[in-house]
Structures are given as C-alpha cells and as structure tokens.
C-alpha cells in the first residue's frame, strides 16, 4: 500500500516509501498463518459461516523513537515523530469500530508481543499477528493468503499513514470487490494505501520496485498481465514528510476529516515547527 509496509529499518524509512500499506517494518518469519494473540485465539471468528465475513489487516510498526517517521526528522525530534506515528496507528484501529461483518487484525512489527500492540488488542478486541516475509511483497502476499486460508470472503490490507482513512474507504473497497478481483487505493506519490482481494493474488506483489513512485503502475501492470480486474479508490495523501503534514492540513481545512487525536498532534507539531525545514 502506500508507504507503510516497507521493511522497517531506519535507513529504509528515510527513503521514499511509496507502495506499501502505510504502517510498519516487516519481519521475516516462518511461512505459516499469522499467529493470533493468545488471549484472542479461543472463539476467534465465531460468526464465520461459509466465508461470509471479511478481514481488515492493518500493517503497523510500534512507535519507537528513531524507528518511525524518520523522514520527518528534522524538523521533528524522534519522540515527536513516534508520538505522531502512535496516534496514527490508534486512530486507524479505532476508525474500524463502526464496521460490521469484518474481523480486524493488526499485523505487527517488530512483533505482536510488543506492549503497544497488546494494549490495543485488549482495548479494542482486535486480533494480532506478526508480519511474515523477507520483503513487503512477501508480507502482503502472506497476510492475504492466511486470511483466505481462514475462510474469509475478502481481505483488505491497509497501512497507517493516511490520517483521514475512514469507514467509507473500506465500504467502497468492499463494494468494488463485488465486480473486480483486486482493489487499490492510490496515494499521490505513486504508491497505494489499500489493497484488497477476494482470493490470493501473488502475481500482484512479484517484482515490484518498492519504495519508488512506480509501485502503483507496476502493480496494475502485473494485475493486467495476470488477467485480474482492478478497481481504484479515490487517491489520498499519506504522511511521510513534514511537507506532507503541511499540505494535508491545508487540504483538510475545509473538509474536517481528521480524527481528534491525530488532528491535535498535527496542529501541535505545526505550531512548533510550521516554518521549519529539513537541514
């Protein structure tokens, strides 16, 4: 998806991160299904009947200073960047609460045992899993395949870099999947913030130049080559740099689409650093 979903070293985080589910680094792990957090395993998906439910899988990093939003530093300090990232993750989870007929998973990096993720799971009764794969494409392919192996009728993968991602995006994606094989939510930098499907689509993630502005175009070309019909959501701006923050707040001034938590953090950061530029 958009930029969230790249392997999570600080070095990679500083590069342009188009084409990942705005969220977090990807850890390598065994090629089995994502493990659920122990307290949520029992009784998971009790309403699941004949593939009637969907899955939303949010890719996220733990908000560790120096490991997230590094392309905003400077002007932000590492702890400010981590605070912003944590707000984005929490709001991404909370904005799924109104959805019905879906189970919510949080795909975690560096791992689902991190206290930040355990707290979110306990508070919102979401399911946790690890990101599994050597690169972004493998992680997304694994997550989708695991969802379908569990019997879900469709699965949507998203990141956490789109502050105004809301229920309408998920509802529109689900509607598009009724007549398409794949749905993508483009970002303005050439990546995507959401990818959804009704069945495994490994072709979509093969030989993609992750962290470039070619991700969306290459992904659509792979889909076309595989005979997959693609539906597109409206494009959105993700937050990778402080210039993105400035631009987003200008654009949102009339729309008022920001959740309160992230909105407060962004406005505070603008007050502190509004005229600053990277050194």
Segments (PLM) and residue ranges:
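Short phosphate-binding loop-to-helix
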Residues: 118-154, 215
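A short, N-terminal amphipathic alpha-helix
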Residues: 83-102
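Short, glycine-/small-residue-rich phosphate/pyrophosphate-handling segment
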Residues: 202-222
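Short beta-strand/loop segment that forms part of the nucleotide-sugar
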Residues: 101-110
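Conserved alpha/beta core of the MobA/IspD/sugar-nucleotide pyrophosphorylase nucleotidyltransferase superfamily
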Residues: 218-279
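N-terminal nucleotide-binding beta1-loop-alpha1 segment
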Residues: 52-71
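Conserved donor-nucleotide/metal-binding helix-loop-beta segment in metal-dependent transferases, i.e.
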Residues: 165-189
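Intrinsic disorder/low-complexity segments
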Residues: 3-54
């Amino acid at each position: 998806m958009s930029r969230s979903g790249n392997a999570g070293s600080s070095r990679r985080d500083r590069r342009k991160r188009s084409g990942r589910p705005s969220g977090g680094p990807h850890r390598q792990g065994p090629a089995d299904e994502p493990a659920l957090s122990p307290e949520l395993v029992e009784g998971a998906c009790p309403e699941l009947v004949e593939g009637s439910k969907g899955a939303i899988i949010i890719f996220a990093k733990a908000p560790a200073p120096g490991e997230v939003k590094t392309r905003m530093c400077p002007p932000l300090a590492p702890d400010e960047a981590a605070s912003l990232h944590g707000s984005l993750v929490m709001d991404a989870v909370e904005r799924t609460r109104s959805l019905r007929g879906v189970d919510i998973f949080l795909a975690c990096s560096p791992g689902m045992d991190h206290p930040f993720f355990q707290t979110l799971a306990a508070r919102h009764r979401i399911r946790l899993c690890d990101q599994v794969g050597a690169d972004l494409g493998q992680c997304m392919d694994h997550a989708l395949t695991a969802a379908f192996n569990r019997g879900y009728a469709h699965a949507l993968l998203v990141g956490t870099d789109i502050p105004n991602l809301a229920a309408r995006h998920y509802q529109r994606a689900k509607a598009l999947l009724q007549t398409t094989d794949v749905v993508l939510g483009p970002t303005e930098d050439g990546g995507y913030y959401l990818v959804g499907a009704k069945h495994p689509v490994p072709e979509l993630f093969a030989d993609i130049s992750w962290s470039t502005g070619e991700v969306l175009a290459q992904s659509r070309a792979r889909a076309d080559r595989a005979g997959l019909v693609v539906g597109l959501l409206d494009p959105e701006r993700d937050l990778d740099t402080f210039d993105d923050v400035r631009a987003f707040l200008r654009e949102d001034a009339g729309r008022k689409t920001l959740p309160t938590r992230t909105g407060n953090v962004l406005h505070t950061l603008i007050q502190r650093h509004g005229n600053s530029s990277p050194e």
